[in-house]
Curated annotation (Swiss-Prot):
Reaction it catalyzes: N2 + 8 reduced [2Fe-2S]-[ferredoxin] + 16 ATP + 16 H2O = H2 + 8 oxidized [2Fe-2S]-[ferredoxin] + 2 NH4(+) + 16 ADP + 16 phosphate + 6 H(+)
The encoding gene: anfG
Protein name: Nitrogenase iron-iron protein delta chain
Keywords: ATP-binding, Iron, Iron-sulfur, Metal-binding, Nitrogen fixation, Nucleotide-binding, Oxidoreductase
NCBIfam families linked: anfG_nitrog
Cofactor(s) needed by this chain: iron-sulfur cluster
Keyword ATP-binding among record annotations: yes
A molecular function (GO) term: iron-sulfur cluster binding
Stated role: The key enzymatic reactions in nitrogen fixation are catalyzed by the nitrogenase complex, which has 2 components: the iron protein (component 2) and a component 1 which is either a molybdenum-iron protein, a vanadium-iron, or an iron-iron protein.
Subunit field text: Hexamer of two alpha, two beta, and two delta chains.
Any one GO BP annotation for this protein: nitrogen fixation
E.C. numbers: 1.18.6.1
């Protein structure tokens, strides 16, 4: 394999997102990585959709906002979000004293971190294999 060909195979390094609430995001990320199977879908588009929908619904639940349950997909994501929100409230009591704006920022930072760890920063080449 030529040097040019080898360089083309190497995945471009993506930097992890930085957020003001990194320490708290680390705690929530660690919980997901150890307890949530939904992070392990085999394709990047599945992971993108699940990260977005589950974490959006988790944020809505934590903020006491209405949650869209109009489709079967919405209800499926909602089930995971209910479990995650309940566990976050129990295991990380500091989340209960945060404002809606702080929770929104925290959950966006968490989504960015999960996208990085499970998609953009992942070395798993199967995520982008068109034949998989």
């Amino acid at each position: 394999m030529s040097t040019a060909s080898a360089a083309a195979v190497v995945k471009q390094k993506v930097e992890a997102p930085v957020h003001p609430m990194d320490a708290r995001i680390d705690e929530l990320t660690d919980y997901i990585m150890k307890n949530c199977l939904w992070q392990f879908h085999s394709r990047s588009w599945d992971r993108e959709r699940q990260n977005a929908e589950i974490l959006k619904k988790t944020k809505e639940l934590l903020c006491g906002e209405p949650v869209d349950l109009s489709t079967s997909h919405d209800r499926c994501y909602w089930v995971d979000a209910v479990c995650l929100a309940d566990d976050y409230r129990e295991h990380y009591p500091w989340i209960n004293s945060m404002s809606k704006e702080e929770i929104g920022s925290l959950m966006q930072g968490l989504k960015d971190r999960m996208d990085y760890l499970t998609i953009t920063g992942s070395l798993n080449e199967e995520l982008s294999d068109k034949h998989y």
